[in-house]
Amino acid sequence: MKPVIKFEFYRAFRSVGFYVALLLGTALAIGDIVLFHNAFRDTIDTKVVMQTWIGTDYQFVTNSLFYALLPILAALPYAGTYYEDIKTGYLKNILLHTSRRGYYMAKSFVVFVMAAITVMIPLLLDLMAVMTIYPLRMPERLEFLSAGILDVNLFSGLYETNGALYALAFILLDGLFAGLLALVSVCVAERVESMFSAIVIPFAFYIMWSTVMMENNDGRFSVMEMLNPRQSVVFSRLQVVLMAVGGTLVIILWLFLKGRRKDVL
């Protein structure tokens, strides 16, 4: 399986989708820094990292755009290639050299990793950039331009003691869910009519699920709100774990059942 993983990574890092998604995410991050600096240039010396990082900056549309587009950023790099492999006949060729289960494991691993790093890199770059410009001290609770993280919020202890660690915790969480969302494309690839559909379905699912949860359950199981570090909705660690574990088990079961199919296309 290692040769398959190596080759899949080779394909992934040569994918146009990877660089398009990375460029889009980074552009949003840079745009947020520029917008904040231009809006508050007269009082810039009083601002701190947690007011300016895209994850906790609620002043501009860049935060909402990034987290709304997160499934697209996750799926663009490599998630649609399983559909492509089926349609081009590449899957038939690779199954001459490895088992179907081995192929699925390799493909899923690379899809997950590429999705995670594509979402995490812009957030990390933005964090490193604002840390070179603004001090790391924490704003007072409910201070102007502060995200207003309270004791009931997730990772509130980190927010109060070290904003960089708070940001890193959410970046890792975002990377985990980005990987899971990208794997949805792999799960549905055999039942869609185009590579575009395979890439867009995780986004559609993400938006619909989050919208329904916001309307019926105060947003406490809205994935979009759960991944956003500004935390406009209060949720617990247990809810995050349930969503992550539940999503992981469903995807693993789906891929396991696909891998058990007879190696005949």
Question: Where do the PLM segments sit?
Answer:
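Aromatic- and glycine-rich beta-strand/loop motifs that create alpha-glucan
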Residues: 1-25
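Alpha-helical transmembrane segments of multi-pass membrane transporters/translocases
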Residues: 15-17, 21-24, 178, 228-265
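Membrane-helix interface segments
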Residues: 16-17, 99-101, 105, 194-199
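Central hydrophobic cores of alpha-helical transmembrane segments
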Residues: 21-26, 196-209
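Secretory targeting signals
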Residues: 27-80, 109-182, 186, 226-246
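Helix-loop-helix units of permease transmembrane domains in multi-pass membrane transporters
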Residues: 81-113
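Juxtamembrane non-transmembrane "cap" segments at the membrane-aqueous interface
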Residues: 134-149, 204-220
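Short cytosolic juxtamembrane segments of multi-pass membrane proteins
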Residues: 193-197, 203-204, 260-265
